Amino acid sequence: MIKSSSLRLRKRIKKQVTDGIAHIHASFNNTIVTISDRQGNTLGWATSGGSGFRGSRKSTPFAAQIAAERCAEIVQEYGVKNLEVMVKGPGPGRESAVRALNAAGFHIISIIDVTPIPHNGCRPAKKRRV
């Protein structure tokens, strides 16, 4: 016989965050948009591939725009108004993702390029022959 236990389910209250950091990782194959609070705790994220784009369409500026819009929808539940944008990588979705976040109603405080640049560290991979 199954015993019915009285589980108390309470609705989880989302914390209110006004300032956030948008991390945009734009590679040649995909674009990942993550929005976190000032401490680095992730509030929401979206990718071009997760937004329904596959193959070579994942790496387009339009796919990055859609990913940024989806991430903005997720994060607006937290009450985020101001964003610092950190862009990493050489991909084609860099600029369009920033524009999409601006169009979503966020006040962009600053845009910082955090692409890792070696100070002559590891030897790079061989040139592609296509």
From Swiss-Prot:
GO annotation, cellular component aspect: ribonucleoprotein complex; ribosome
Keywords: Ribonucleoprotein, Ribosomal protein, RNA-binding, rRNA-binding
A molecular-function term among this protein's GO annotations: structural constituent of ribosome
A Pfam family this chain is assigned to: Ribosomal_S11
One of the protein's GO biological processes: translation
Function in brief: Located on the platform of the 30S subunit, it bridges several disparate RNA helices of the 16S rRNA. Forms part of the Shine-Dalgarno cleft in the 70S ribosome.
Entries under NCBIfam families matching the protein: PRK05309.1 (NF003698), uS11_bact (TIGR03632)
The family this protein is said to belong to: Belongs to the universal ribosomal protein uS11 family.
Subunit architecture: Part of the 30S ribosomal subunit. Interacts with proteins S7 and S18. Binds to IF-3.
Protein name as annotated: Small ribosomal subunit protein uS11
Species, as recorded: Blochmanniella floridana
Gene behind this protein: rpsK
